[in-house]
Amino acid sequence: MVKLHPGKEDLREGWMDSDNEMARRAGWSLTTERVINRPDGLDLDGLLTRLESSMSREVATVQWTMNYCLAEIGINFAEHRSRAIAIGEALGLFRDYPVSKGCTSPFAPIWIAEMVRRQS
């Protein structure tokens, strides 16, 4: 429902800095949606810096949505791909996440490489 709200950009920015874990998660979810669908004017370098500096300190539920954002930046923007992969490697989040046969790991470097491979 929020994704259709005309003021979602203000909500996105505010929620990313919220004290509430679920609001931060929603903020990162809206950010990922923007990365995928409307990246014009979005500071991708700034987002990568923020992900790199704060993702490891977040609670698991927020890390999951931040990781999704990191992966989508790496998948959709070749000029940011190596940095997104390097951040994923350095943080190591979801490196050992159990994955069913035939599924793609949520570990950002693996996820990015696989999605880029599928797109080519």
Tell me what each language-model feature is.
Residues M1-S120:
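Alpha-helical scaffold domains
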